Amino acid sequence: MAEGLVLRGTMRAHTDVVTAIATPIDNSDMIVTASRDKSIILWHLTKEDKTYGVPRRRLTGHSHFVQDVVLSSDGQFALSGSWDGELRLWDLNAGTSARRFVGHTKDVLSVAFSIDNRQIVSASRDRTIKLWNTLGECKYTIQDGDAHSDWVSCVRFSPSTPQPTIVSASWDRTVKVWNLTNCKLRNTLAGHSGYVNTVAVSPDGSLCASGGKDGVILLWDLAEGKRLYSLDAGSIIHALCFSPNRYWLCAATESSIKIWDLESKSIVEDLKVDLKTEADAAIGGDTTTKKKVIYCTSLNWSADGSTLFSGYTDGVVRVWGIGRY
């Protein structure tokens, strides 16, 4: 019996591109999404046939596209980054913005929480990476010298604690690995022939995957800073994520969502959206009128690896579940 993914349902409330999806580590019935509609939505997962989740709260305050959102490990707070140049920390219970982080001079493209939630890192079009405490104080700015020479599109903490690490991706075509303790550069990973949109670190912190304009995913050994192999996705890559419990890597590309088994390096799933079927299933069936090409821009697994949440350019979150066939 092979394992595959089937469309379980959709979640509709955003009116523009879904830019990021954050899932809780305790697998509770909630997720948080960010969008170009300038809002962040806290969803309650009903897991019903067609409507997989309903919006419980809409968090507003950013004055431009919200580009990224992550959750604190206790699920009480969300952290967002926006094209308005700010980060915001949100109290999800109160539905209010607890803190604003001001310091970047251009759009904030990516944000991340450290494992202990005490440190926050952000990446911006101003070419810098900033390290903050949770009070909103900028503790360090990585700029000039070893820093990226173009927009910093993505930043992630490595989950392995022995050597706390930040990984960043940039439009300068490189991925950089930094020591968190002193913000010093450990490695520059070069190999992409176009801008890099996204970087993901494997659950054990040993691997890093990067992707972007050239449509090729590069896999790197994080400790050694060496390139291991590449996977051809065939079109621009907007998001990457590792499965938490299978040796799988997912890529959101402009043609489909592709999932690789990293052991065999073969594609196990190629998920495409059938708008006609979806419109027939949806109430009103109005999706067929939209002739725009839609594609996935954000991805995240549930903590138990059974559900893949995917956000699209049409503002819809599509939810895929593991099934056997």
UniProtKB/Swiss-Prot annotation:
Keywords: Repeat, Ribonucleoprotein, Ribosomal protein, WD repeat. Transmembrane segments: none annotated. It holds the Pfam family WD40. GO terms for molecular function: ribosome binding; translation regulator activity. Belongs to the WD repeat G protein beta family. Ribosomal protein RACK1 subfamily. Plays a role in hormone-mediated cell division. This is Small ribosomal subunit protein RACK1. The gene is GB1.
